Amino acid sequence: MKLTCVMIVAVLLLTVCKVVTSDQLKKLRRECYLEPGDSCFHHDGRGACCEGTCFFGVACVPW
């Protein structure tokens, strides 16, 4: 029982670390350059917003 709980916690921690690391790497590589609330009208919406998505070409909206 304890081993199962430890394994579940380990998987959850690895998943969270993977998400955080991928976001940090994305910013370091300059794949994203717009923060939430920034206008994305003149930018390609794919990958331009660091957090969230480009909402109808108007602004970056966090998820």
Curated annotation (Swiss-Prot):
Disulfide bonds join 32-50, 40-54, 49-60. Probable neurotoxin. GO terms for molecular function: toxin activity. It is found in: Secreted. The cysteine framework is VI/VII (C-C-CC-C-C). GO terms for cellular component: extracellular region. The keyword Signal applies. This is Conotoxin Cal6.37. Expressed by the venom duct. Residues 1-22 form the signal peptide. The keyword Ligase does not apply. Keywords: Disulfide bond, Knottin, Neurotoxin, Secreted, Signal, Toxin.
